[in-house]
Amino acid sequence: MDINEIRKKAENEYMRWISHLTPNDEFYEELHELKNNPDECLDSFYSELTFGTSGLRGILGPGTNRINGFVIRRTTQGVANYLLGNIKKPSVIIGYDSRKGSDFYARETASVLRGNGIKVYLFNELMPVSLLSYGIKYLSCDMGIMITASHNPKIYNGYKVYNNQGHQIVGKDPQSILKEIEKIDFFSGIKYETDGIKEVPEALYRSFTKKILDISTNVNQEILNNLETIYTPLNGAGGSFVKKVFNSIGYSNYKVVKAQEFPDPDFKTCPQPNPEKLLAYNEAFGLLDSDGGDIIVATDPDSDRVGVALYHEGVRTLVTGNQLGILMLDYLCHVRPPQRNQKVYKSIVTSPLVDKISKKFGLKVVEKLTGFKYIGETIAELEKNNSLNEYYFGFEESNGYLAKPFISDKDGVSSAMLSVEMAAFHKAFGKDLIDRLNEIYEEYGN
C-alpha cells in the first residue's frame, strides 16, 4: 500500500468516526480539530494499535491508533470472545493506575465484560499492578487487566493483560486475542452492562500486605530508623501502599515528596515519571537538600518498579537498575543465606556480576528473555511442580525485582521496603549504597 492509499484509508476511517461520535463522547472536540492537522489525523488513523504480549500502549486521543474508549471497548469485546471460547464461566479482575482516563477505561472494560456475562471484580481505587497480579490467584480469576502505561509520559495510557497465573500473557495467547479483536467493529457488536460488577474484598488487601511483610529482613528498629529516607510515588499508585508497609515494619524516619504524594495524571513535577531517570528525582533531591536525608526511594506510576538515588561524595547519584539488583542480591545473600538448589532468575541483559555473586553463595543462575513476564512464567511452572522453594531472587535491569515468589510479577512495594532495610543495614557499618557497590566491584570485578 503506497502513501496515497494509506492517506485515503485514514481519511475514510476519520470520516467514519466523525459520523459516529456525539458531543458526549470522549475526544469529540479533539476529533473535529484533526481536520486542521492532516499529519496528526494521518497518524491517528493510518493503522490500529496492535495488541501484543504487553497488551496495548499508545497516545491518548481519538482514532484507531490511539488509546480511547472505543479502542478499549473493542479490545475488551475481543478479550471476552477469547475467554468465552476457552473457559466455561470465566472471571476477570481489573485494576488501574493514576493516569488520565485510567479509572474510566477500567469501568468501561468491566462493563463490556459484564455485558458478555463474565464475572468481574473491579478495584474501587488505584493500586499497584502487583496487587492485581496477587488478586488474580487469590480470587481464582482466569485473567487480570490493568489500565496503565507504566512509567511513560502523561500522553500515554495502556491495557495490560495477565493470565490466570498472574503474569503478563505469553506464548500463543496474545495472537489468539488479537485475532478476536480484529473481528470486532469499533461501533457495533460490543456488549455492555454496568450492573453486577463486584468490588474487590478487603481481605485481598490484608493478605497482600502480609505477603509483602513476609519479605522483610527484620532489621533492628534502632538501626532501621537511623536511616533518613525521602520517598516519592511519582504521583502514582504506590504512595499509600509503600507508606503502610514502612509503618508496618516500624519504620517512621521518612518523608514523602508532597508535590508527588497523590495521584496526578499530568505528572506536573515529573514529566518522565521513570525511576530509571535521574531527572525523575529532582523534587525529591530538593526536599533532601532542605531537610536532609540519606537516600531517595521512588516507585513508578503503577508501582511495579523501584529506584534509588542519593548524594555520594556530594554528587547526585542514581543507582542503576542493574546496580540496585546486584546490591539486593548481595544483601539478601548475607542476611538470608540461600538454601541448597535455590536459583536466581535474571533477564539476558542483566549484569554478569549476578553470576559471580551467585556462584559464591551456591546459587544457580537462570537466564530468561527480556521482560519480567518470562520470570513470572517460570514462577508459575515452579508452583505447578511444587518447587517454589527453588526461587531465591529475580530481577531485570529495568528496575524490576521480586525477592520472594508470592506473585508472578515484579513488585515495587516490597522492593521499596527492601531498599530501605538494605540501606539502613549498610549505614550501620558507615557505608552508603555506592560504598557497598564499590566493595562488590573490588571483590568480583565489574
Q: For each predicted feature, which ranges?
A:
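Phosphate-binding and adjacent anionic-ligand microenvironments
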Residues: G293-I295, V335-R336, R340-N446
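Conserved phosphate/anionic-ligand binding catalytic regions in large, soluble enzymes, centered on
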Residues: F45-N65, A149-S150, T229, P233-V245, ...
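An N-terminal, well-structured beta->alpha segment
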Residues: I3-T109, N116, K198-N226, A237
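Short glycine-rich phosphate-binding loop at a beta-alpha junction
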Residues: P90-D97, E228-Y231, Q342-I348
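Gly/Ser/Thr-enriched, mixed-charge loops and adjacent short helices
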Residues: W17, T22, E40-F45, L49, ...
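Short beta-alpha connecting loops at secondary-structure transitions
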Residues: G158-I169, T194-I197, P265-Q272, V308-T317, ...
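N-terminal small/polar loop signature for handling phosphorylated ligands or for N-terminal nucleophile
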Residues: I93-Y156, S252-V308
